[in-house]
Amino acid sequence: MNSSTDPTFSELNASFTNTPDTLFATSVSSDPSHGFGEEDYACGTFNCSPKEFVAFVLGPQTLPLYKAVLITIIFGGIFITGVVGNLLVCIVIIRHSAMHTATNYYLFSLAVSDLLYLLFGLPTEVFLYWHQYPDLFGMPFCKIRAFISEACTYVSVFTIVAFSMERFLAICHPLHLYAMVGFKRAIRIITALWIVSFISAIPFGLLSDIQYLNYPLDHSRIEESAFCSMSPKIVNEIPVFEVSFCIFFVIPMILIILLYGRMGAKIRSRTNQKLGVQQGTNNRETRNSQMRKKTVIRMLAAVVITFFVCWFPFHLQRLIFLYAKNMDNYLDINEALFSIAGFAYYVSCTVNPIVYSVMSRRYRVAFRELLCGKAVGAYYNSGFARDHSSFRESSAYDRVHSVHVRASQHPNKFETDSSSANRVLIKKTYSLPLPKNADSTVLSTTDIVIVLENSHTVCEEPKVENDIWIENEETCI
């Protein structure tokens, strides 16, 4: 969390002992017309020195050693796993040309945004537990960190939503997906969401600054109280937190639930249809189909749960800060939420590579090659079907044991670029094993049709031809 994305910094950090109410009282008391009374600071008859006053409002300059060490260890583990995981995703996508797909471009964008946020946000966050005030980095760093951290947060949310939309179209509306398929479209979308995210984060960068407490007796500024935050007055007057909550949590959460719920229902429906057709087959195929269905649905559920768990505490804390400062035990609740929200917020940067990448067999093989130095690169051009989604059920060779060949009468209908000229349309007519060196995109049909290709085009044109209905069951992005 940071000076702008986290409400705790707008209230001087939830770990500070008497943060929100006393801080706002301080801001008001800087006006000479506002009389200072015992109710404002509860500092007795106010015999406090400036140093004692700062300690009363902001809490201790350094948190207890056990807490600082524990948080450093936990956040250090999050930092290492998050940086390593996201770096591996980026390196794998860059190194292997077979990974240059629309889906992986979204994953690359997500990994970069998570990396930037971890690098700019987490070290400073840990430092605050050891030295809460005065701020040592200055106003430029305060603004830059607030701006970049907020922007990267928005990029992550937008990327997850865009990625979910791609999956939804591929699974539920494959005929519509073909009209939009292509790397350039994915790059344009990613570029647009980065631009929109950075524009949306500009107010947080502009409004964040070094804030100070004012000594109530003479209204002088206490230099030792410097901290990076948005002005409490601005937070109360401009609904930055409310807008952020609606646009970057409520709406994305609703979209993700609807999209993945629809995808889960579609996968379940198709699996049940297959089981009905396969009643005469052996029980092993039925069990395998059921296992694949459960695996995919669990992954879909994991996406929704992960998004909610990682982001809800963060936004809940903002809302409590804005609307529940007068509730009983507010400070205790806010301090607990600070720890929970901070942990969940940064854990999302670590979990994303797992949820969206590591669950894919292709990524697991690539990671083993990268970490262990094993020469398994041939996997990417071997007999496995393209595995561009973490929801991949199986390879083409595992699912289709024999297919039949015929020449396509209209090959040009399938061309999407000049590199796609060496494709063969295969239809069930004569028995022929699927070549193990085929790089294929699986298309579920009533009469099996598979397109073998040697290009980077990742989704073939859905087609209705005679008695053939080509329906894309899995993501072909």
UniProtKB/Swiss-Prot annotation:
The protein in question is named Neuropeptides capa receptor
What positions does the record give for glycosylation?
Answer: N2, N13
Which SUPFAM superfamilies is this protein grouped with?
Family A G protein-coupled receptor-like
Q: Which residues lie on this side of the membrane: Cytoplasmic?
A: 94-109, 167-189, 259-295, 357-447
The entry's keywords: Cell membrane, Disulfide bond, G-protein coupled receptor, Glycoprotein, Membrane, Receptor, Transducer, Transmembrane, Transmembrane helix
User: Where in the body, by tissue, does this protein show up?
Assistant: In adults, expression in thorax and/or abdomen.
> What GO molecular function annotations does the UniProt record carry, in alphabetical order?
neuromedin U receptor activity; neuropeptide receptor activity
Q: Does the keyword Nucleotide-binding apply?
A: no
Q: Name one GO biological process term.
A: positive regulation of calcium ion transport
Q: What does this protein do?
A: Acts as a receptor for the neuropeptides CAP-1 and CAP-2, but not CAP-3. Probably a component of signal transduction pathway that leads to Malpighian tubule fluid secretion in response to these ligands.
Entries under Pfam families matching the protein:
7tm_1
Q: Which domain of life is it from?
A: Eukaryota
**Localisation per UniProt entry:** Cell membrane
Please give the residue ranges for the topological domain Extracellular: 1-72, 131-145, 211-237, 317-335
Q: What is the lineage of its organism?
A: Eukaryota, Metazoa, Ecdysozoa, Arthropoda, Hexapoda
